[in-house]
Each structure stands twice: as C-alpha cells, then as structure tokens.
UniProtKB/Swiss-Prot annotation:
Region feature (Disordered): 277-366, 445-541
Gene3D superfamilies, A to Z: Cyclin-like (1.10.472.10)
Residues modified to Phosphoserine: 396
Gene Ontology biological process terms in this record: cell division; regulation of transcription by RNA polymerase II; response to virus; trichome morphogenesis
Keywords: Cell cycle, Cell division, Cyclin, Phosphoprotein
Protein's name in the database: Cyclin-T1-4
Composition bias, Polar residues: 307-325, 519-528
Similarity-based family: Belongs to the cyclin family. Cyclin T subfamily.
InterPro entries found in the cross-reference section: Cyclin-like_dom (IPR013763), Cyclin-like_sf (IPR036915), Cyclin/Ssn8 (IPR043198), Cyclin_N (IPR006671)
Length: 541
C-alpha cells in the first residue's frame, strides 16, 4: 500500500506538460477537494459554529505555523510538511474548529504525511516533539512528557484523532504539489533560474497558509508564484513565439490574477493583537482554550521564520527532499531576509494590483524589495521645473526648496550676465572714444587717405553695432572705420587742436609739449598713432 501511495504522490510531482496531460484521469478523484472562495469563506463548518472568517483565518495560519515548526524539528522534507498542511486544510473544510483541537489534528496529519510521503517518523518522536511545541512556555514540559501517564494520554489522543482524520479525508491520500511544475517550468525559461526558483518556491510555501490549495490546481499556484517572483526580481519571462510563458501552465489570466492576489493578501493583513489572539483562542471549543497563555500573538514575521525555512534548519533536510521531487530548488531563508522582503512584496502588489493595496506596515514574509518589488520614484517625476511659466511643484518641503533654489540661481546668473554685459559696453565705449580721438589725429592726413582707409574697412567687413565694434581680422590687420553709424554725439567735432590737447593731457600730463609737437612735427601724429596701434590691437583681441 505504501508503494501505491508513494507512486500517486510521485505522479502528482510531474512536470508542467505531463501534469496537464496525465492528471486528467485523477481529476475526478480530487475534484471534491476544490471549492470556490465564497463557499470556503461563508459556508465552512466553523462558520456554522459561530466562528467568523477572521478567527478562522487566524486558526488556519496557526496550525500551518505549528506544522512547519513540527516538521522542521522532526527533520522531514518540505514536501512532507506541505502534505500535512493540505491534509489539515481538507479536514477543516469538512470539520469545525469549535469541535476539534487544531494542534491535535495537525499532529495527526504530520504523522500521516510522513507515511504517505515515505518519510515516516516514529509515533513516539511525533508525540514528544508536538507536546514540547504546544507547551513550550512550560519549563517542565520535557520532564512531563517522559512520564508514562502523560505520554500514554497523548498517544491515545493522537491515535483516536488519526481515525477521525482518516474518515474525514475518506482515505484519500492523493495530494498534488506545485513544486515540481514550478521547477520544470523555470528550467525552460533559462533566465535567472536559481533566484527565480528560490523566490517562487518561497511564495508557494507562504501560499500554504491560505486556502489556495482548496481553490486552485497545483500548476495554477505554481504559475502565480512564478509571476510574483518575476515581478520581484524584475525579470522578463521569455515567450515562445506567440505563446506566452503562463500558457505552459494551462491557466487563464483571471486565474493567474486571483492566485497572485490571494498570495499577496497574506502579507497585507495586520498583525493580530495579543488581546484578539486570546479572544480567538478562548472562543474555540475543545482542548485549545487552555493553551491560550502559551501562544504568542499572531505575527506574520514569526510565521515566516518557520514557513520559509525550507526543509528545516539544516541543509540536510533539503537534500532529503530530493527523494520527493522537491529539493531541486530548496534554500534556507533567514528570518532577517524575511523581514527585509516585506516591503518588496507590498510594493510589487501596489504596482500590479492596486485594488488590494494596504499600508498596514506588516512585516510580511517572502522575498524582498519587492526591492520595494520596486517602487522608487525619481524626483524628476515628482516635480519637474520647466521654467517660471510652466512649473509643477509637489507639496513636499524638499521640492519647494529645490524650486526656490533653482529660481534664485537663475536670477543670480542673469544678474552676473547683466554685469558682464554692462562692463563690456563700458569697455567698448571707451574704445570708441579712443578711436575717435585717434581719427582726429589722422585728420591732418589727406582726405583721400581717409577715404581709402574707409573703403578698406568696408572691404574687410568691419561692423559697427551700437556699442559693440566687431572687426574682421582675416588678414591680421586692424581697420578703423569711422562711418556714419557712429553715434552723433561721439562724432561731434570741436577743433582738432582742442582734442589733441585733451588727448595729450590724458596721456602725457604735459599739454604744452604735445601742442608744440603737433605743430613742429607733422609726422608726429603718424608716429603717435603707430605707437598706440599695437596696444589697441591687443585690447581688441
């Protein structure tokens, strides 16, 4: 019988294509374990016993965390833990939490899962470890369980519970997991295989704490996990021609969206305060009420430290999971990494599924950041400064300060530019005055020579532009063009002697010598002009 059960489970771990092709014969057998979400949330046996959805959701997470911890201590593969969780989900979709102690049922499911997956653990070990976890706040727990009376009582409880679980499950041990379809599909992608497999694997493990396995087939869950993992890693999954990657899983876009959203909902839920946990515990009948004081508040971060450590606290557990087709992508996820992963998944969900956006600040398990899966907004996108006429300023003080600084910088630049312009204008004006005086000195020359020089200036493209004089020095010559474009106020002529006298005073502080030089030496003007020409030429450059 064990061989038959193992063969069924191995069949359930087949690849994506073979799963879709060969599992048709088994669909009728497992169809009774698939329900609609509305049916699960509104018509469950626990709801009929006045346990609301919030309490039942907490109880579901509670026994999943318990099973993860129990499996790690028993050092069983992750696939065995997953099988035990699915057995527990199936049991409580048919039975009420008010009539059954979830920890006792979970212990029975772990014992059964070990036998189904051919990784059995002795009943004594299962009982002892389970008892220690349930009463972990009691320092005398290790001594109590060694007492024969206590042990026999627990043993009888587990064996009676096994009968109830077997009858409730209808002796149906066919369980299909998303692990193998997940790994087989990622092998085909050839894109960030290791990272993608690890993150998607963790999403599958976290999804065990929801009712996804009661709503969707394993390959649908695998597709949702790969979708979220790709979003987190920002990996573009390849497509084969017109066939996109998710079509390999025989899943519709609506199913893919539903699976992804429900996985993300797990991380959005607020932490349950200790008072609410106590209320939930006390409201549930059976033997669970007297354990209220020993249970901490329901924190997703704490649950993550148990559920995301794949295959236990050592790598040996992962190696053993290879026998069940689940160890190919096994990894050890630290608790610190789980805390860091919260923001990534929240941001991933914010980008992909705004309808389920939550700002509860839950330290969610899983792979990160969803780097925030994403989302950094550059400041340029928040507040773009196009100009004073078209400015979009955000409400943050930082953006307002940036805008003010930029405006101030622009005003400073304009001010500096204006000062440079005025300075240049002054230099040019002085230069023009000097040129005018020099032209007066040249007045003693023939009019013909002046006209020739004027024509030469025209040929060389001299341009007088208001206050700026631009000289074309194509041939290395400086040509003076005293044209009619000069301002009339600058061309106002007095007597040549007076202007020469003024120029002499400014340059030599000896007006008499200059005046005599102009009279006695006709060539003095030419000589004086020649001496000043190189200096003016250098200023022009």
């Amino acid at each position: 019988m064990a061989g038959v059960l193992a063969g069924d489970c191995s069949f359930g771990e087949s690849g994506v294509s073979s799963y879709s092709r060969n599992s048709n014969e088994k669909q009728d057998e497992v169809a009774r374990w698939y329900f609609g979400r509305k049916e699960i949330e509104e018509n469950s046996p626990s709801r009929l016993d006045s346990i609301d959805l919030k309490k039942e959701t907490y109880l579901r997470k509670s026994y999943c965390t318990f099973l993860q911890d129990l499996g790690m201590r028993l050092k069983v593969p992750q696939v065995t833990i997953a099988t035990a969780i699915i057995f527990c989900h199936r049991f409580f979709i048919r039975q009420s939490h008010a009539r059954n102690d979830r920890r006792t049922i979970a212990t029975v499911c772990m014992f059964l899962a070990g036998k189904v997956e051919e990784t059995p653990r002795p009943l004594k070990d299962v009982i002892v470890v389970s008892y220690e976890i349930i009463h972990k706040k009691d320092p005398t727990t290790a001594q109590k369980i060694k007492q024969k009376e206590v042990y026999e009582q627990q043993k009888e409880l587990i064996l009676n519970g096994e009968k109830i679980v077997l009858s409730t499950l209808g002796f149906d041990f066919n369980v299909y997991h998303p692990y193998k379809p997940l790994v087989e599909a990622i092998k085909k992608f050839k894109v960030a295989q290791n990272a993608l497999a690890q993150v998607a694997w963790n999403f599958v493990n976290d999804g065990l704490r929801t009712s996804l396995c009661l709503q969707f087939k394993p390959h649908h869950i695998a597709a949702g996990a790969i979708f979220l993992a790709a979003k987190f890693l920002k990996v573009k999954l390849p497509s084969d021609g017109e066939k996109v990657w998710w079509q390999e899983f025989d899943v519709t876009p609506r199913q893919l969206e539903d699976v992804s959203n429900q996985m993300l909902e797990l991380y959005e839920q607020n932490r349950v305060p200790a008072s609410q946990v106590s209320e939930v515990e006390s409201s549930v009948g059976g033997g669970s009420a007297h354990h209220v004081g020993s249970r901490p508040s329901a924190r997703l971060t704490h649950e993550h430290s148990n559920s995301d450590n794949l295959g236990g606290s050592t790598k040996a557990t992962q190696n053993r999971s290879n026998d069940n087709g689940s160890g190919e992508a096994g990894s050890v996820i630290t608790e610190q990494k789980g805390e860091r992963d919260t923001e990534t998944k929240d941001s991933m969900h914010t980008e992909s599924h705004p309808a389920h956006k939550s700002r509860s600040g839950v330290e969610a398990p899983g792979e990160d950041k969803i780097e925030k899966a994403g989302a950094h907004f550059p400041e340029d996108d928040k507040s773009r400064i196009v100009g004073t006429a078209d400015v979009t300023v955000s409400q943050s003080p930082k953006d307002i300060k940036m805008f003010r600084d930029k405006v101030k910088a622009k005003l400073e630049a304009k001010k500096v530019q204006g000062e440079k312009t005025r300075k240049k204008d002054l230099v040019d004006e002085d230069d023009l005055i000097e040129r005018e005086l020099e032209d007066v000195e040249l007045a003693v020359e023939d009019d013909k020579d002046i006209q020739n020089k004027s024509s030469m200036g025209t040929e060389h493209g001299e341009i007088l532009d208001g206050n700026n004089l631009v000289v074309n020095t194509e041939e290395g010559e400086m040509i003076d063009d005293v044209s009619s474009t000069m301002p009339s106020r600058k061309r106002k002529m007095e007597s040549p002697c007076e202007k020469q006298l003024g120029e002499g005073k400014r340059r030599h502080d000896n007006s008499e010598n200059v005046e005599e030089g102009q009279k006695t030496n006709p060539g003095g003007s030419s000589h004086s002009y020649g001496d000043r020409e190189p200096r003016r030429h250098s200023q022009e450059r």
